[in-house]
Amino acid sequence: MKTSRGATAVQMDEADVKSAYRRWAPVYDHTFGRVAGEGRKHAVEVINQSSGRVLEVGVGTGLSLPDYKSSLEIVGIDLSPEMLDKARERVAEEGLENVNGLYEMDASELKFNSNSFDTVVAMYVMTVVPDPAKVMRELARTCKPGGEVMLVNHFSTDDGVRGWVERRMAPFGDKLGWHPVFDTDRVMICPELQLIEKRALRPWGIFTMMRFRKALTAG
């Protein structure tokens, strides 16, 4: 498939994602977990200014769980059972009583009622799912009216060496387990979500935080 930037991308499916994260699970915390740590920390700091129920989609090994304030009720989901095993170990070892469930679940088919969470956050998720549009609609559906949907993610660029590398990596997305070429317009699809903040994050601005507010009424 050709992307809007002219790179040839491959379609990923659930098996590709599970296979990739089965390989990553044993070393995730010490590799990508470190690279993405600053963005994850910043997102949780923002969420900690809110209250109520939080759904973390793509909770992984639970790296963010100890950083949420104790008054928030946290629910996490992930497609990888290996990642979730590590997250559950973390919850038990650190006594995180505000974590109220970690579930193996497909982000494109969330098993929660509509309007269930005050905040829905997906960190480093949108480039690893086979159908980002479907996932985005599920994030919006499960968020309460007036609540917030937050993304932290890599979004591609046309510029310089980084853009050149992303385009060269695009055909290998199924093996990498993520889409190197991924535009912001792929998540700007839900009319009920208003973008309230977009910010490049440290280090180096590779990752971006996007915050959306869900409309109080449909339409």
Each language-model region and where it sits:
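C-terminal alpha-helical "lid/dimerization" subdomain adjacent to the S-adenosyl-L-methionine
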Residues: T8, A15, F32-R34, M150-T208
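Class I SAM-dependent methyltransferase Rossmann-like catalytic core
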Residues: R22-G33
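Class I SAM-dependent methyltransferase SAM/SAH-binding core
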Residues: L55, V59-E109
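A short SAM/SAH-binding and catalytic strip from SAM-dependent methyltransferases
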Residues: T119-D131
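A short glycine-rich, Lys/Arg-flanked "PGG" loop and its adjoining helix->strand segment in the class I
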Residues: A133-P145
